[in-house]
Amino acid sequence: MSLTVVPAYEHPQEIGALFSEYTQALIAGEPSFSGYLSLQNYDEEVQHLEEKYGMPWGRLYLARWNGAPAGCVGLRRMDEWNCEMKRLYVRPQYRDKRIGGKLVQQVIDDAKTIGYSHMLLDTFSFLDSAVRMYRALGFYEIERYNNNPIDGCIYMKLDL
């Protein structure tokens, strides 16, 4: 049983499938999330991954478990000092393997190497295991930092 984490730019179909599963899971938990996707230009994001997550300021990773696509995470630049973790998702059948934590640690390490001072994220309160993981990694709650209109959203920050 092995985990590999690789840059995802050469795997658009696998990332597209993971992003689709991710958004469907969020819409199932919070139906109003579908409206927020349009504010984020989500369809365009999926078609042009490198524009949002490309190097040198961003990252996009694909996690594989025994070669099968298991999860993903993105990192995007907000400004010179701040970045945002996006689209962390692990398929349900792989959630007991600590893949999410490895993906998050990968983008934290990258953010430090790039030179960011802070990493931000938004998540939903119903994603309780993710919120617990973020807190365990040092993230803390902050005020809203983006245009997310959804009630029940949690905004978090990590000092790098």
What are these regions (language model features)?
Residues 120-131, 135-155:
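Conserved catalytic-core motifs of GNAT/GCN5-like acyltransferases
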Residues 80-82, 118, 153:
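A generic structural signal for beta-strand entry/edge sites
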Residues 95:
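Glycine-rich ATP-binding loop(s) of histidine-kinase-like ATPases
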Residues 3-86, 91-92, 104-106, 110, ...:
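Acetyl-CoA-dependent GNAT
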